[in-house]
């Protein structure tokens, strides 16, 4: 008698191997930090363990289109002092990727105009490596929360706080962390009363002295920042900052050493890395975009601090992580003043993650390699539910 139609014994049937978790690496975006985000994505795609994870690279163009892109990390590096662009990597100039709209179904769909949408399969976790507005500021995180898709890094509130330097400093102050003097010029102030806005800054300089740093309130990677030595350069600095954000922040220059510390979420809670020191770049007025990414000004890892100073900056970095309700990872930036006091400058909820970035270097020196860092972040996201937590 033929047995081909008889029920199989489940214990004797060949079992389908478990599906590997699928990670969508989302990068690019509409902010001024588009190119650095692409470089970061290239580093993550090169480091992620393909034996453990399936990977889906999704780039967001400068005009906001979600595109399927080539999985070719070697094309995502800085070349000839130029950062790459999602449009150069996109598989189509018109097609778009659609996220799930039902939390019970995590299937991602690709759609071309005039064609039947194509299912790309389920995504288990999103690794967003976007920097700046429309990606690092809580907007993307809110979209993923609505879709019910787990994601790497800070949630909606922490991302928003970490992006807006004014509210970040307010949160730190309320939790007892020391911040430097600053002033804020909101869009309406500059647009309706420029003389009043200028007077506000001049009065601030009169109290705290020149030079000042004028910067976008909601941007990173040192983009749009100008060091202003006197009143003559003020208007130009304001307009440069406003090219990136209509709201600007003015900070007093602090004399001291620039110290950074990484925070990473482990199973038992956040831990701090060994700190790093950013020496004054010889060819730049301060640690600007060119020094960070183009000329690769090297940091000192670990920072030459005393044991007591190291322990204190690590404590403060974790305190900043907790104050902003962060998750996943943070880089906390401090000044160690001439009075031997740590003043927190800012946190980055998605810090620079390129091979030359300080965050991976600090964790490498702490015993966590770049591939392990990527793996820990993905695993933390897989453990964490979306929604209120």
From Swiss-Prot:
Start-end of Polar residues biased regions: 1-12
Organism: Streptomyces coelicolor (strain ATCC BAA-471 / A3(2) / M145)
Cofactor(s) for this UniProt protein: Mg(2+); Mn(2+)
Associated pathway: Cell wall biogenesis; peptidoglycan biosynthesis
Catalytic reaction equation(s): 2 D-alanine + ATP = D-alanyl-D-alanine + ADP + phosphate + H(+)
Source species, domain of life: Bacteria
Location of the ATP-grasp domain: 169-379
Protein name (Swiss-Prot/TrEMBL): D-alanine--D-alanine ligase
